[in-house]
Amino acid sequence: MLLNNMNGKLIYKILKYIRSSKIITFVVWRIKIEKYLHDTFWDLTTLVLKKELNQNKEKNKYLDMGCGQFAILGQYFKKINSYSDVTSIDVYKEFIENSIKNSIQNKNDINILQSNLFSNINEKFDLISFNPPYVPASTKNEKLEFPNIRYSDLEGIQTAKDFLSEAKKFLTPDGIILLGMNTFYVPQNVCVKLIKDNGYKLEKITKMKFNTSIVLKLKVI
């Protein structure tokens, strides 16, 4: 048990270093980082979303929901499809301000604005991605300056549920949703049920080796 705890702590420290390294972030995302607001630049779910963005780079109008402090996915998509119209949004004003500065620094021409889910959105998109907070609030053991980047309700699905209940209205007829979740916190069967209960067709589930995160590709039924 002691060995397992030590291994777990070591893995956590390694992952934290990787996700807070400016050099690794540039190698993985081709984005330079200067100012940051918290020390986790991206997570394991973001990596799987990147894989799916590469598979759907022909989409022209992309909404990066919950873009965080750098709008990493929005900026990355603009790099792989320079003709795309990209909008990145987040609920935190501080993240929006920092993302705007970072996108200018990296010379990525994308739209970045503050919005609580779709509250400030009035157009439709070919592609919407979301990496919602999915850590159950029942496991909350730390005080964060920006808690909405990590914690949801007691089961970890309320934010995703709220998103899915609105997202249909903001998709073009052939539009798709890429929903990122982490099965370490929310089991895959719970994710699938959530999708079906909200009237979506599950096209596929994308995974990566040694990664508990998944991306569910959805279409409106």
Model-predicted segments: where are they?
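Short, conserved glycine- and acidic-residue-centered signature motifs
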Residues: 41-46, 92, 156-160
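Conserved Class I SAM-dependent methyltransferase catalytic core
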Residues: 159-215
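SAM-dependent Rossmann-like transferase core, predominantly class I methyltransferases
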Residues: 12-79, 211-217
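Conserved beta-strand termini and adjacent loop/short-helix elements that scaffold enzyme active sites
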Residues: 36, 113-115, 205-208
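Conserved SAM/SAH cofactor-binding pocket of Class I
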Residues: 47-122, 127-130, 135-138
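Mobile active-site "lid"/loop adjacent to the S-adenosyl-L-methionine
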Residues: 132-159
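Short amphipathic alpha-helical segments
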Residues: 100-101, 140-144, 190-192
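Short, basic/low-complexity N-terminal boundary segments at the transition from targeting/disordered tails
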Residues: 1-14
